[in-house]
Amino acid sequence: MAGGTGGHVFPALAVAEYLKKKQWDVFWLGGTKGLERQVLNLEVSRTLFIRFAGVRRNGVLGWLKLPLNLVLAIFNVVKFLIKNKPNVVIGFGGYVTVPGGIAAKLCRCPLVIHEQNATPGLSNRLLAKLSKKILLGFPNTMPKGVHVGNPLRSAFSSIPPPELRYRERNGRLKILIVGGSLGAKVFNDIL
């Protein structure tokens, strides 16, 4: 499960792609308004897109609607988990992982979270206490986490390393820095 931005969705897609190649049934849980609905091009066994959104930029009304929206989202995910009986639920962050992680715990399904960032996101910080295992893209970013790196889709593994790609090149390299769909404060501050 992952939602919202590419930083959560693309690592989840990489793991889903890998598990599909290993003949696992892969179920996808995402949000109705996130990027995942547009980029989910992999054939998964079943999908559930829930109506649940972050509240940080939704003002007082968003906070007032949160309890009801959370309960409804958890209920929908519990139904999905009971019907599909997954062996494990893996969360990659984003707002939809909160009801998904709570539902996994209620259904006694092991929850594993993966934090891709050097500064953990709110969803993963909340779900860490419910998780059986915490996987990290960067070392020492969450207590009790295990550093495994960030998953990449197979399309990236076929790209030759820079030493081979640029061995014939002369002159300076031009570098494009991309900060992600929500921006990256460190890049904005430095540049």
Which residue ranges define each predicted feature?
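Conserved nucleotide-sugar phosphate-binding/catalytic loop shared by glycosyltransferases and other
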Residues: M1-G3, K20-N69, G179
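Active-site-proximal region of nucleotide-activated glycan assembly enzymes
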Residues: D25, R46, K105-P162
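Donor-nucleotide binding loops and adjacent catalytic segments primarily
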Residues: G34, V39-E43, P161-L191
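An aromatic- and histidine-rich active-site surface loop
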Residues: G34-Q38, P86-C107
